[in-house]
Amino acid sequence: MKKIKCALIGPGNIGTDLLYKLRRSTVLEPVWMVGVDPASDGLARAREFGLKTTDKGVDGLLPHVAADEIRIAFDATSAYVHRDNSDKLTALGVKMIDLTPAAIGPYCVPPVNLDAHLDSAQTNVNMVTCGGQATIPMVYAVSRVQPVAYGEIVATVSSRSVGPGTRKNIDEFTRTTSGAIEQVGGARKGKAIIVINPAEPPLIMRDTIHCLTDGPPDVDAITASVHAMVKEVQRYVPGYTLKNGPVFDGNRVSVFMEVEGLGDYLPKYAGNLDIMTAAAAATAERFAEQMLAATAATA
């Protein structure tokens, strides 16, 4: 079966974990890995897998986009450089999947709003943040039952799973996640907190979600909605687990999640990486299926 060729920008923790997932895809073929450090472990690993690599950043990829038929690019670098990367590649007709908190394109949380993006001509979609991917489905599970006045999430991740790019983007993480809690999750006001836990051995990703509903919560409907949404996320993140809840206290609905990774590049405790890369891969696969269908229709 024909596959859509893609490039990965940023050979760090997220980019390398994503590479493992793309190599298993039936519709995506990773052909380029882009970095800036010639000694990068991620670039070396990509070469071992047979990818073409450059340590000259996106500028090193641009001359090859047309010849190598790159249709989709994943940016796993930093919010500070994403706009420049995106402008250069979308000008060549490449669809960008943004794994930084830059959020210059619309937010995408696959089980909530991916279908809406398939029907639009977006050239850039933003995968929010690891905390957003883990928690926004739960906020939405409540808000689709009844209005949510306030949604607050706390994402706790192991220090060892957090690379330098994420550490530089903590402010962007909180702003982007808070915005997506409102725009995608459906809360009128959103707040996001990230806790980087240095404990050894490293702890698995844990997420706490609190929603304040307008009026008394519909216990049965919200409980059913939360359980249904957990199953939706588990289709691409099998380690997404409801540990407790929903717990009801007055107008407050609390949900407690745990995210275990597949252990592709980093150990299973790094569920924060896994949910981000799995969501990006799932999103790109839907775009690829759409591209392949369009190609078949014109053939």
UniProtKB/Swiss-Prot annotation:
Catalytic activity: acetaldehyde + NAD(+) + CoA = acetyl-CoA + NADH + H(+)
Enzyme class per UniProt: oxidoreductase
NCBIfam families, A to Z: ac_ald_DH_ac, PRK08300.1
GO biological process: catabolic process
Binding sites annotated in the UniProt record for NAD(+): S161, V162, G163, P164, G165, T166, R167, K168, N169, N272
This protein's record includes keyword Oxidoreductase: yes
Active-site residues, as the UniProt record annotates them: C130
Keywords, ordered alphabetically: Aromatic hydrocarbons catabolism, NAD, Oxidoreductase
Family named by the database record: Belongs to the acetaldehyde dehydrogenase family.
E.C. designation(s): 1.2.1.10
Pfam families per the UniProt record, alphabetical: AcetDehyd-dimer
Protein name in UniProt: Acetaldehyde dehydrogenase 2
Keyword NAD: yes
Entries under InterPro entries matching the protein: Acetaldehyde_dehydrogenase, Acetylaldehyde_DH_C, NAD(P)-bd_dom_sf, Semialdehyde_DH_NAD-bd
Organism per entry: Burkholderia lata (strain ATCC 17760 / DSM 23089 / LMG 22485 / NCIMB 9086 / R18194 / 383)
